[in-house]
Regions:
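Short beta-strand element of the conserved SAM-dependent methyltransferase core
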Residues: 6, 66, 157-159, 265
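Active-site-proximal loop/helix segments of hydrolase catalytic cores
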Residues: 142-212, 223-229
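A Lys-centered signature of the CheY-like receiver
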Residues: 220
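Residue-level signal for inorganic ion chemistry
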Residues: 217
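Bacterial N-terminal signal peptides
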Residues: 5-15
């Protein structure tokens, strides 16, 4: 009995130590923080990333490359193909609402493959601390092909780097709950699906974007200029819109716009020569 008590005590101590060592999210702690000023600039995806900045490249559909100053490469909604450039990402994230958001056969050379789902209905919890970047997720529900609901089947991934809080809403099928908003914390930059049908209706997506109050909103999951233009036509006067034809931008805390800005990026696969 004494041995059993000692064993339990050791487990509790180890759990407490793990909780103490787990890096806290500054995006939650600073959810009421004030964003920076100035603006952001275009760049090639292969350019060195400026100090205290993150490069964002729109690859395709819901897939983005995030690159840090130290050369850490993360690809969202990874399908197994990013382009002709021989890139092995350090991290890929995936959601499984449709095959255009994941692959069952990621390259085994990728060090970290983060699936946005777990056992059916159970969800999954990610908290990957890579030093330069902390990656975590907030689970939401998705509809399945049979008209039912898979609880916690989608992940909103949050990437914390260079003092920024960058969110990818994934295949969002419902307005987040107050608890989910609280778990997200502050999002300076957010990638949001704007198709208006397969994911959230536009009215609900605009509600979500209004609640998040992100400085930079990057539309994704638009299937044509028609669906993109339909979304842009619904944007209220509180948003600025930038559409300069670029696929890549670099953003930092000091370069966030003073007004909420829809920044349209044009999807382009990664090429070795750009």
């Amino acid at each position: 009995m004494r041995a059993l008590c000692c064993f339990i005590w050791l487990i509790l101590c180890a759990s407490a130590l793990h909780a103490q060592e787990r890096r806290a999210s500054h995006c939650i702690a600073l959810a009421q923080g004030t964003p920076g000023l100035a603006y952001l600039h275009k760049a090639s995806w292969q350019d060195p990333v400026a100090r205290d900045s993150v490069l964002i490249r729109y690859i395709a559909h819901a897939s983005f490359l995030l690159r840090t100053e130290g050369g850490l490469n993360v690809v969202t909604d990874f399908t197994g193909f990013t382009g002709a450039a021989p890139l092995i990402p350090d991290v890929v994230t995936m959601n499984h609402a449709h095959e255009t958001h994941w692959t069952a056969h990621p390259d085994p050379a990728i060090p970290h493959v983060l699936e946005g789902w777990g056992p059916f209905g159970a969800g999954i919890d990610h908290h990957l601390d890579l030093g330069e970047m902390l990656i975590r997720n907030v689970s939401t529900d998705i509809r399945n092909m049979f008209g039912g609901v898979e609880q916690r089947g989608n992940s909103i991934f949050v990437f914390e780097a260079a003092g920024l809080c960058i969110g990818h809403l994934g295949h969002l099928h419902h307005v987040p709950t107050p608890e989910q908003y609280a778990a997200l914390g502050r999002l300076d930059v957010v990638m949001a699906a704007v198709d208006g049908g397969i994911t959230l209706p536009l009215d609900q997506m605009l509600e979500v974007l209004g609640r998040l109050r992100s400085s930079v909103i990057i539309p994704m999951h638009w299937f044509s200029d028609y669906s993109l233009d339909r979304f842009l036509a619904r944007i209220g006067p509180e948003f600025d819109v930038v559409d300069d034809g670029s696929s890549t931008l670099t953003v930092s805390l000091r370069s966030l716009p003073s007004r909420p800005t829809i920044h349209v990026l044009r999807p382009k696969h990664l090429l070795e020569e750009e």
